[in-house]
Amino acid sequence: MEGGAKSNDVSAAPIAQPLSEDPTDIASNIKYHAQYTPHFSPFKFEPLQAYYAATADSVRDRLIKQWNDTYLHYDKVNPKQTYYLSMEYLQGRALTNAVGNLDIHNAYADALNKLGQQLEEVVEQEKDAALGNGGLGRLASCFLDSMATLNLPAWGYGLRYRYGLFKQLITKAGQEEVPEDWLEKFSPWEIVRHDVVFPIRFFGHVEVLPSGSRKWVGGEVLQALAYDVPIPGYRTKNTNSLRLWEAKASSEDFNLFLFNDGQYDAAAQLHSRAQQICAVLYPGDATENGKLLRLKQQFFLCSASLQDIIARFKEREDGKGSHQWSEFPKKVAIQLNDTHPTLTIPELMRLLMDDEGLGWDESWNITTRTIAYTNHTVLPEALEKWSQAVMWKLLPRHMEIIEEIDKRFVATIMSERPDLENKMPSMRILDHNATKPVVHMANLCVVSSHTVNGVAQLHSDILKAELFADYVSVWPTKFQNKTNGITPRRWIRFCSPELSHIITKWLKTDQWVTNLELLANLREFADNSELHAEWESAKMANKQRLAQYILHVTGVSIDPNSLFDIQVKRIHEYKRQLLNILGVIYRYKKLKGMSPEERKNTTPRTVMIGGKAFATYTNAKRIVKLVTDVGDVVNSDPDVNDYLKVVFVPNYNVSVAEMLIPGSELSQHISTAGMEASGTSNMKFALNGCLIIGTLDGANVEIREEIGEDNFFLFGATADEVPQLRKDRENGLFKPDPRFEEAKQFIRSGAFGTYDYNPLLESLEGNSGYGRGDYFLVGHDFPSYMDAQARVDEAYKDRKRWIKMSILSTSGSGKFSSDRTISQYAKEIWNIAECRVP
């Protein structure tokens, strides 16, 4: 290998043997790529980086063969195909996943050993693709893995963000955001498709043609260029695509005259605006420009994807003669992952009417039979509402279409259900508020989709009973539940190989990796002392690995013999990281007041918290700062730091999760009941034998049912109690627990430094008012939370009981595979079938 360690080279000259499974041939192929697919000059050769690039290129050879076979097979069979549109994907590292799914992990490990390298070290060179932020993006990626594993004809569509959301640094000031330059070196996993380019128009105006038809003209036109990422299934030949769009301007939009005149910015204005579209995920939208940019991103994804879908439909149908538009919904299913891709609805209508010449009724029939919508939230601020003025400016033709959909919807309801007249203001798509008229994107989705689903049973029940109750009375069969799931490949098989090996040994099969329900058979061994010893040993190996990682990234030394207590998720007041840290503060204060002998009787604990706070979300950033300040004080206090450590884990992403989750023993899912649609990290922790402390919210409800109430540390108000508790608070009826007051007072005493935490603490105080009145019920749930934590401490001391609970947690996780979720989508929403590559 060029510039590498010569002594370990396999001696033969490198040859490309892309499909061989012999380690010597693979080593030769890796060497071949190092020489002939160079990503570095020979003078700047970094062995690990270069071995990663060459190994990835070598694995990609196999993927491309399977990818082409899959595409040709789908083309020949012409099945109905699903297209999954999402603003976010959180793929994680592709190399680990590819060698695992292709079942070539050991062969590649041996090949790299022959070259003097370790696969584990080579894998570490890959940066996570920064294409998402939280659960929404990770769910989309789990779904893609399951679609391929189940041999379903399905593609994902997204945007190729240059800098992602942001990279999180933790400094003395708290969270600092810098660009996440994941493409800084290169990504060997994406293939640019220079032949797949579509025009995307913004602004302009609508022209009425002599025929009476309408045409959107003028404005500015950018190009959408496709980058494809292969999505291999587990032990199957099917390899699907994630197609990511990048924005660019055409060469005609570069003004050479102005450039040569020294007017460089003016010469390339459109090029500059094109670069903005895929620069970052969720650009700040406090300004008019920010709102326009977000809307541009959403439309860019919708329009490019639809043009591509229509082109493929025509190509496949025309191969049989000519295409019939009535066939479109029989060949295409489009799933909108939340409201971000809602503009798919008016854009499909526009393409069918204005470009293909169909009438309104036929276009509407096709659109409403093709599109389905997944709702992910009941949080009012997350239900998108766009200013009508901004929409008219950017997308004038689409606003005409939305107006017509709204008008026809209102007319239908008034004629068929006059009893709903007083509900129309909240049901209609266009809100004609005199001061700030908006478009309700969720309403547009519900009116225009054939199916609407929630993502956990409780969430779907709340949607039907509250958020969309009036629509349910009109379309009772339109609403479904599809409880979320996770891929067992990434979330246990690959990230916790020791535990996976034990499960396979005791079940006498590895079929559980694709049939997770088989885990239930572990229950019969839940008291077996031999399994207990193996289980505890695997958990300890994962904890030691995690302790090394924490020392490496934070400099904090943690004890693997302490209870590892982890809360990792987006920082948000409803997810209540504040409840967690207030509990930690109270624990610290009590430990501080104990004698050394008393401390020895406590359960030592390491509390880890991680997640990103949106750059403009001030209170969330204050919570990050508080966690880091508490950690600084607690970890350097010699009286207590053998019994309590507090760590903020920076820049939480998929790869960090793959380290944290296998090493966790207690995981906190403590949102205010009724506010978390589902949650999926709870499923990942439970699958890895981690016990949950949580509220009856989202998928917690179903996890508790599956693993058994005795194996779940429950606390807090229930979803149906929350509205009354908020009313009681407004009426001054809330009496705070003394422990809660003590924890807040301890912060105010300056115990954790001079930072002004009053604005954060005041959000928990008073009875009402903006940013006050403890909307998320931290104070109400604090006493039952502390009592549940005391139960955790007691349970952890009884090792036999704890390990049994851990085994039962894993064995009860069979329902939460994304394979089950996707099978249900395929049968009950998309109406698509397996299309296995022979």
From Swiss-Prot:
Superkingdom of this entry's organism?
A: Eukaryota
**Which EC number(s) are documented for this chain?**
2.4.1.1
Main localisation: cytoplasm
First-level EC class: transferase
What's an example GO BP annotation here?
glycogen catabolic process
Q: Which SUPFAM superfamilies match?
A: UDP-Glycosyltransferase/glycogen phosphorylase
Keywords annotated in UniProt? Allosteric enzyme, Carbohydrate metabolism, Cytoplasm, Glycosyltransferase, Pyridoxal phosphate, Transferase
* The keyword Nucleotide-binding is assigned to this record: no
* CDD domains per record: GT35_Glycogen_Phosphorylase (cd04300)
Q: Where is this region: Disordered?
A: 1-21
Pfam families according to UniProt: Phosphorylase
Q: Where in the cell is it found?
A: Cytoplasm
Keyword Repeat recorded: no
Residues recorded with modification N6-(pyridoxal phosphate)lysine: 684
Q: Its function? A: Phosphorylase is an important allosteric enzyme in carbohydrate metabolism. Enzymes from different sources differ in their regulatory mechanisms and in their natural substrates. However, all known phosphorylases share catalytic and structural properties.
Which family is it part of? Answer: Belongs to the glycogen phosphorylase family.
Database matches in PANTHER family: ALPHA-GLUCAN PHOSPHORYLASE 2, CYTOSOLIC, GLYCOGEN PHOSPHORYLASE
Q: What is this protein called?
A: Alpha-glucan phosphorylase, H isozyme
